[in-house]
């Protein structure tokens, strides 16, 4: 049976690989950040239970990283529609690089948030003045994932520009 696909037959593989990479790596970063900072919150809560709700900020910030990967994965997967238009290797590579940019940025941000969150909430239990400093460092770590999201959106928008229509 002949394929009705117009474009390069292997290109969608790279596009879908980019969508998977965005979601998998971002969720790995979110999981690591949530687990690492959650351990810090749990051990800090034994000493100072009144600070538990204030100390879940790193856990929430780490959880947001998975949403960034989901956004890029949805953008990429909606851009892969071989029946609507041809899909070339340039498009697949653009989507792959988009997914890797967002996913790996989310992974590294999750690692930073987890480490800073763990140490920060434990230190906050000993010295409450450190809370603002911890939040600022967490914001800078979260910005790393935002950079990946922005670059991922820009790279994903490049798909489809390899041909004159």
Curated annotation (Swiss-Prot):
* CDD domains assigned to the protein according to its UniProt record, in alphabetical order: ATP-synt_Vo_c_ATP6C_rpt1, ATP-synt_Vo_c_ATP6C_rpt2
Any one cellular component term from GO for this entry?
A: plant-type vacuole
Site feature: Essential for proton translocation: 142
What residue ranges are annotated as transmembrane?
13-33, 56-76, 96-117, 130-155
Signal peptide from the UniProt entry: none
Q: Where in the cell is it found?
A: Vacuole membrane
User: What's a Pfam family in this record?
Assistant: ATP-synt_C
Question: Found in which tissues?
Answer: Expressed in leaf, root, flower and silique, with lower expression in roots.
MF terms per GO, please?
Answer: proton-transporting ATPase activity, rotational mechanism
Subunit info here reads:
V-ATPase is a heteromultimeric enzyme composed of a peripheral catalytic V1 complex (components A to H) attached to an integral membrane V0 proton pore complex (components: a, c, c'', d and e). The proteolipid components c and c'' are present as a hexameric ring that forms the proton-conducting pore.
| Family in the record | Belongs to the V-ATPase proteolipid subunit family.
Please state what the protein is called.
Answer: V-type proton ATPase subunit c2
Q: Which gene encodes it?
A: VHA-c2
């Amino acid at each position: 049976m002949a394929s009705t696909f117009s474009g390069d037959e292997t290109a969608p593989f790279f596009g879908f690989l980019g969508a998977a990479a965005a979601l998998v790596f971002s969720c790995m970063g979110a999981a690591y950040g949530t687990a690492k900072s959650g351990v810090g919150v749990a051990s800090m809560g034994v000493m100072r239970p009144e600070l538990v709700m204030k100390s879940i900020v790193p856990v929430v910030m780490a959880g947001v990283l998975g949403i960034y990967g989901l956004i890029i994965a949805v953008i990429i997967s909606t851009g892969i529609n071989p029946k609507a238009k041809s899909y070339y290797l340039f498009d697949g590579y653009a989507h792959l690089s988009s997914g890797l940019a967002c996913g790996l940025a989310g992974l590294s941000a999750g690692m930073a948030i987890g480490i800073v969150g763990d140490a920060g909430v434990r230190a906050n239990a000993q010295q409450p003045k450190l809370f603002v400093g911890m939040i600022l460092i967490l914001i800078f770590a979260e910005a790393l994932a935002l950079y990946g999201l922005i670059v991922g959106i820009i790279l994903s928008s490049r798909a489809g520009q390899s041909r004159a229509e």
